[in-house]
Amino acid sequence: MALLSSTLRAPLVFSKNPKPVSLSSLHSRIYLSPRSPRFPSLRFISAAGDTGDAEKPSSNISDEWGEGSEPETKPFTYFKLPDSDPPKDEDEWGKGAAAGAGSYNDAGNGTPTFAAEASPEAEAEDGVDENLEGLKRSLVDTVYGTELGFRARSEVRAEVSEFVAQLEAANPTPAPVEEPDLLNGNWVLLYTASSELLPLLAAGSLPLLKLDKISQTIDTDSFTVVNSTTLSSPFASFSFSVSASFEVRSPTRIQVTFKEGSLQPPEIKSKIDLPENINIFGQQLSLGPLLQSLGPLENVVANISRVISGQSPLKIPIPGERTSSWLITTYLDKDLRISRGDGGLFVLAREGSSLLDQ
């Protein structure tokens, strides 16, 4: 019956000329249900009459059969807290782990940190640099003890050629002539397969004579190249050089024209330093008796040194058709240079480089 009476009164609200409803009357018809455990609900009660008084809400609710029933109570929902502190799979915006996948660093309780990841390009570059350093060191170790290649056996030459080919394939400076900061400077010869240097290398293997150093100085500002050689003996050291000019023919090739040779005055040693034994054609020769008679000879050597010191170097022009040559740089970095000329292969290290430390 309550349902029927409510249905009969409902059209009065939507009649053509309804009676105005005051705010106080409307407010009295709205109440908050105290039985909802989670959210308040709004209930509207039909007007009882023209006076606008609201009916007292009943605590019982009638169903469609007219029987009273208690209002249903919604079960309370429990929320499971995350197992980790702070949570790994969600942030304050409700986003999951996909937003920061791969960048979360579990540091326990506290503020999470984000680890910096190296780019693939940087890792690849580091790998290439390490590979080149390993190849350079292997090449230097292979040529060590070969007297600049003069005493290198066939298997050693083959191994050197393999290392050189790998370095040339990974050359970090494809246009060395256009890189003066790398090309300029003094370069010390480590190994050569040049037939033109064989007589000089052979002289360094003579008894009481040692080939100390062969070097090449390049100056791209003046377009000059100077090849220098130093020999030493128990009595003195000798230095001579050959100067040349060059023209750039390509980013890797220069054309060299030799001008003149220069012989420096010998540097006489204050004390004669003879070994006790020398090897001559496979025979050991003792120099003991000679060492005992060197006392008076040292005074003569000291006088000669004072006479020739301060003398100007001897200049020797280089005539003939063989005054021109070409040189291609096939590998260049801050401390190693590989060049090929019409006379063969040259492996050089920059003066002061750690590659010269053996």
Curated annotation (Swiss-Prot):
Residues 1-47 form a transit peptide. The keyword Membrane does not apply. GO terms for cellular component: chloroplast. Residues 48-114 are annotated as: Disordered. It comes from the Eukaryota. Pfam families: PAP_fibrillin. InterPro entries: PAP, PAP/fibrillin_dom. The keyword Transit peptide applies. It is found in: Plastid, Chloroplast. Keywords: Chloroplast, Plastid, Transit peptide. Belongs to the PAP/fibrillin family. May form together with other plastoglobulins a coat on the surface of the lipoprotein particle. The coat may contain receptors for attachment to the thylakoid membrane as well as regulatory proteins that may function in the transfer of lipids to and from the thylakoid membranes. This is Plastoglobulin-1, chloroplastic. It comes from Pisum sativum.
